[in-house]
UniProtKB/Swiss-Prot annotation:
It comes from the Viruses. A motif (RCR-3) lies at residues 81-84. It comes from Milk vetch dwarf C3 alphasatellite (MVDC3A). This is Para-Rep C3. A motif (RCR-2) lies at residues 42-44. ATP binds at residues 174-182. A divalent metal cation binds at residues 36, 42, 86. It is found in: Host nucleus. The genome of nanoviruses is composed of six to eight segments. In addition, some isolates contain subviral DNAs. Its EC number is 2.7.7.-, 3.1.21.-, 3.6.1.-. Initiates and terminates the replication only of its own subviral DNA molecule. The closed circular ssDNA genome is first converted to a superhelical dsDNA. Rep binds a specific hairpin at the genome origin of replication. Introduces an endonucleolytic nick within the intergenic region of the genome, thereby initiating the rolling circle replication (RCR). Following cleavage, binds covalently to the 5'-phosphate of DNA as a tyrosyl ester. The cleavage gives rise to a free 3'-OH that serves as a primer for the cellular DNA polymerase. There are 3 rolling circle replication (RCR) motifs. RCR-2 is probably involved in metal coordination. RCR-3 is required for phosphodiester bond cleavage for initiation of RCR. The gene is C3. The keyword Hydrolase applies. Homooligomer (Potential). Rep binds to repeated DNA motifs (iterons).
Length: 284
């Protein structure tokens, strides 16, 4: 039988004499409890964990307590039941910070803002994701174009102002370097609903893209990687069926939402690897 796990639990702890002190640890996000007397003295409570825990793990937090996985429709109801007045003798008491349903993402960023160094030690992967989001939002809020627009840049803007379709890939070609391709690519990618990639292996690129599958995408190909342009990824993004095989294989379908794809490169497309009719070439 699979082990029962949950982030939300209710508990009862019988006692005699003085009210016991509950030894909550850093795994507990929030707890509320009160002294009740229905035939005998006991503590009735609700606990919200930071991550899913098994029954055995919960019993280790409060030895001797009877635990059950939350059965209420939501955590608000379970919390209210644990603090009901009709059977209360003393309390209620609270520990930690309660996270309402639907607010998890906001609370994670609040934790990051409150103490990024603690998160860096506790969960380095989560810290890096929060840092990435924060830095992107900061750059996006201050992004400005302080240069005169070149004709090819005007042409790109005209192309992306049109409604995207399922085929056209905008390919910005500048063989010499110094035309402003990368500067313009970075600027475009800071627009809301846009993402940036420098190319790379299929599984890495699609893992990143699957995090924001509805984005328009800018691919800024370094000169050193010009002969390794990943045409398969470009087509998957345009076709709106994306297969991410990294860590956990998933298929993302977004058939009714075409997006723009722009490639900035020092080379022309290799038409042995992609259909010529897909390409809208913009010369720098």
């Amino acid at each position: 039988m699979p082990t029962v796990q949950s982030t939300c639990w209710v508990f009862t702890l019988n006692f005699k004499g003085e009210i016991p002190i509950l030894p909550f640890n850093e795994r507990v996000q929030y707890a509320c409890w009160q002294h009740e007397r229905v035939g005998h003295d006991h503590l009735q409570g609700f606990i919200q964990m930071k991550a899913q825990q098994s029954l055995g793990q919960m019993k280790a937090i409060i030895p001797g307590a009877h635990f059950e996985k939350m059965r209420a429709l939501n955590s608000d109801q379970a919390k209210a039941y644990a603090m009901k007045e009709d059977t209360r003798i003393e309390g209620p008491w609270e520990y930690g910070k309660y996270i309402k349903k639907g607010s998890h993402k906001r609370k994670i960023m609040e934790r990051f803002e409150d103490d990024p160094e603690e998160m860096k030690i506790e969960d380095p992967s989560l810290y890096r994701r929060c840092l990435s989001r924060k830095m992107t939002e900061e750059q996006r809020s201050t992004a400005e174009w302080n240069y005169d627009m070149k004709p090819w840049q005007d042409q790109v803007i005209q192309e992306i102002e049109e409604t995207p379709d399922y085929r056209k890939i905008i390919w910005v070609y500048g063989p010499k370097g110094g035309e402003g391709k990368s500067t313009f690519a970075r600027y475009l990618s800071l627009k809301q609903g846009w993402g940036y990639l420098p190319g790379g292996p299929t599984h890495d690129m699609l893992h990143i893209i699957s995090g924001e599958p509805k984005n328009n995408w800018v691919f800024d190909i370094p000169r050193v990687a010009s002969e390794y342009v990943n045409y398969g990824v470009l087509e998957q993004v345009k076709n709106r069926v994306m297969v991410n095989t990294k860590y956990e294989p998933i298929v993302i379908r977004d058939d009714n939402h075409p997006v723009h794809v722009i490639v900035f490169a020092n080379c022309m497309p290799d038409f042995t690897k992609i259909s010529e009719d897909r390409m809208k070439i913009v010369h720098c």
